[in-house]
Design a protein with these regions (language model features):
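Domain-level cores of phosphate- or acyl-group-handling catalytic modules
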Residues: 1-304
Length: 304
């Protein structure tokens, strides 16, 4: 690493932050929470904060030959936003031809072992900018996936009426009459402030009623760890996808205990998983645009 790059490895802590303006993840609540919980880690600004992204794709670009391989990419968040794309590391590729499903954790085991070592004991590293050795440690701040991949990595099935990993059994999902198995989730207004005008709006919302419920309670770190610990005993292999825990689809959607829980600090992370905004932003734009131009089959307005 060049002296200039090594100097920028402390940018996340030394840059000027503006109140209510987020230019870097270190300005966010999750990063600040991690620093407060682990002061010995945050005291050394050269310690590395990582993000992990993975998703499946067909490398042949053809739907005629189904194939799914999964690259696992690590990115360094210490650097300024403009430098991060150059320091994205392909740590592994999970080969196809089919999706690894729950067996993904078997492939990730070596990576988790290395991350655990980097957190617990660190690695002796030479700092080119300061011309000195130091023990560098590293922490995985979060993962980034689209929603289907999120379910595979996290261990919570994103299908069915319990697809929402936040609401869990406290959702208000129902099946549309003419849409077969598709579940319709209509819980978003309860996350609004109590006096928000959309809560009382009957006219412009599908269900046509006033929303009085509040958002479901958020599980604490210990409560969530206790829950996922109940779903850790699965046997990986060809039959792993056929194993189901009691109550699946009725009271929960857990299919496994994610291997990321083996990281000693994972339970203290405030934000463990992020949704990839690429599809979200693209879908929102297309829906709004097609509604504005009144494209009959693509508009958000329901025609009966």
């Amino acid at each position: 690493m060049s002296p200039r790059t090594a100097e920028h490895m402390t940018w996340h802590q030394s840059h000027h932050a503006v109140d209510r303006v987020m230019v870097h993840p270190s300005d966010g609540e999750a990063w600040k929470h991690f620093n407060s919980v682990h002061p010995h880690f945050s005291a050394e600004s050269r310690n590395v904060c990582l993000g992990l992204c993975t998703d499946g794709f067909n490398p042949f670009g053809s739907f005629d030959a189904p194939y799914s391989c999964w690259p696992v990419i690590l990115t360094v968040y210490n650097l300024p936003p403009g430098m991060r794309p150059k320091f994205m590391f392909l740590s592994m590729v999970i080969p196809g031809p089919s999706s690894p499903g729950r067996n993904r954790d078997v492939c990730l085991h070596l990576l988790i072992d290395e991350l655990t070592q980097l957190w617990s004991s660190g690695v002796l590293t030479y700092d080119m900018s300061r011309k000195q050795n130091f023990v560098m440690r590293a922490a995985l701040m979060w993962t980034i996936n689209d929603f289907p991949a999120y379910g595979m990595v996290y261990g919570w099935s994103t299908h069915g009426k319990l697809a929402c990993p936040y609401c869990i059994e406290n959702n208000k999902a129902f099946t549309l009459t003419n849409w077969g198995k598709a579940s319709f989730f209509y819980c978003h207004r309860r996350f609004l402030p109590p006096n928000h005008r959309y809560r009382k709006n009957r006219k412009d919302f599908f269900v046509g009623r006033v929303e009085k419920d509040v958002a479901p309670p958020r599980l604490s770190d210990e409560e969530l760890l206790d829950v996922v610990s109940e779903y850790g005993d699965i046997v990986f292999g060809l039959q792993s996808g056929k194993q189901k825990f009691p109550g699946f689809g009725l009271t929960h959607n857990w299919v496994k205990r994610s291997i990321f829980w083996e990281l000693p600090y994972w339970k203290t992370n405030l934000l463990r998983h992020n949704l990839d905004v690429m599809h979200i932003e693209n879908n929102v734009f297309e829906n709004i645009f097609n509604t504005v131009i009144d494209e009959y089959y693509l508009t958000l307005i329901l025609h009966f």
